[in-house]
């Protein structure tokens, strides 16, 4: 893999409880909304679980993902192709954190910042079930 080793951690406040955040990260029908303009391989499961694998595309950039760890408040992906490394999500009531370490020719922190901004906006529109 060509590129530079990069590591970035961002934690932001969000207007949502942990359960809503979890659903927005684990359910492809939700994360495909806020991760636009990325597209995804066909055949995604309804909910990601350990060993789920899929491909994301952003223009010509292709990244393979595999869920390697999943707890009630965290998820970790192994990444390869466009980024060789990992992406870890952690969340709780009112906050979400994204940590990425990997080798890429593109600036990982820029994409991470934009994605967290989109997630914040998406979560602000979600309603807490009664």
Per-region residue spans from a language model:
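Hydrophobic ligand-binding cavity/cleft-lining segments
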Residues: 1-45
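Glycine-centered tight beta-turn/hairpin loop motif at sheet-sheet or coil-to-beta transitions
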Residues: 5, 58-60, 82-84
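Hydrophobic/aromatic beta-strand elements that line small-molecule binding cavities or substrate pockets
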Residues: 12, 63-69, 85-93
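Short, intrinsically disordered, mixed-charge
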Residues: 23-37, 72, 117, 121-128
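A short, surface-exposed loop/turn module that caps and links secondary-structure elements
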Residues: 42, 55, 60-71
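C-terminal and inter-domain tail/linker signature
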Residues: 47-51, 64-65, 88-90, 99
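Short, hydrophobic/aromatic-rich segments at coil-to-beta transitions
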Residues: 47-55, 69-78
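Beta-strand/loop substructures that line and gate deep hydrophobic ligand-binding cavities in soluble
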Residues: 74-130
């Amino acid at each position: 893999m060509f590129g530079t080793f990069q590591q970035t951690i961002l934690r932001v406040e969000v207007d949502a409880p942990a359960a809503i955040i979890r659903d927005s990260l684990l359910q492809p029908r939700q994360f495909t909304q806020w991760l636009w303009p990325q597209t995804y391989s066909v055949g995604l499961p309804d909910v990601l679980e350990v060993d789920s694998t899929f491909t994301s595309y952003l223009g010509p950039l292709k990244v393979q993902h595999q869920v390697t760890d999943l707890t009630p408040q965290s998820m970790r992906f192994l990444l390869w192709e466009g980024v060789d490394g990992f992406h870890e999500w952690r969340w709780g009531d009112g906050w979400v954190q994204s940590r990425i370490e990997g080798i890429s020719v593109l600036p990982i922190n820029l994409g991470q910042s934009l994605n967290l901004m989109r997630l914040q906006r998406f979560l602000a529109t979600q309603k807490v079930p009664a």
